[in-house]
């Protein structure tokens, strides 16, 4: 690698809106995020299946059980 052309890669603090913080490495000193593995529904197991406006039922009525 050439000297002086690459950004400094140092320790960084990641802060989530839920209050969770953790350390990683980045070219930035602080990273703010809206969602992390501590509050994301996929990782917490609080995932909900949302059927918006009965689209599944409407599909089944229209095309039947294939």
UniProtKB/Swiss-Prot annotation:
Superkingdom of the organism of origin: Bacteria
- Kindly list the cofactors needed: Zn(2+)
Question: For this protein, what is any one GO molecular function term?
Answer: structural constituent of ribosome
Q: Where does this protein hold Zn(2+)? A: 16, 18, 36, 39
GO CC terms: ribonucleoprotein complex; ribosome
Give the record's cofactor note, including how many are bound: Binds 1 zinc ion per subunit.
- Keywords from the UniProt entry: Metal-binding, Ribonucleoprotein, Ribosomal protein, RNA-binding, rRNA-binding, Zinc
Return any one Pfam family short name. Answer: Ribosomal_L31
Q: Supply the InterPro entries for this chain.
A: Ribosomal_bL28/bL31-like_sf, Ribosomal_bL31, Ribosomal_bL31_A, Ribosomal_bL31_sf
Biological processes per GO annotation = translation
Q: Where along the sequence do coiled-coil regions lie?
A: none
In its keyword annotation, does this UniProt entry include Ribosomal protein?
yes
Report the protein's function.
Answer: Binds the 23S rRNA.
Q: Which NCBIfam families match?
A: L31, PRK00019.1, PRK00528.1
Q: How does it assemble?
A: Part of the 50S ribosomal subunit.
> What is the similarity comment for this entry?
Belongs to the bacterial ribosomal protein bL31 family. Type A subfamily.
Question: What is the protein name stated in its UniProt record?
Answer: Large ribosomal subunit protein bL31
């Amino acid at each position: 690698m050439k000297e002086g052309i690459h950004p400094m890669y140092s320790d960084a603090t990641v802060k989530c809106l839920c209050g969770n913080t953790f350390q990683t490495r980045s070219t930035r000193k602080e990273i703010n995020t809206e969602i992390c593995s501590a509050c994301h529904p996929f990782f917490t197991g609080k995932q909900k299946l949302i059927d918006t406006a009965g689209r599944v039922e409407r599909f089944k009525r229209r095309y039947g059980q294939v």
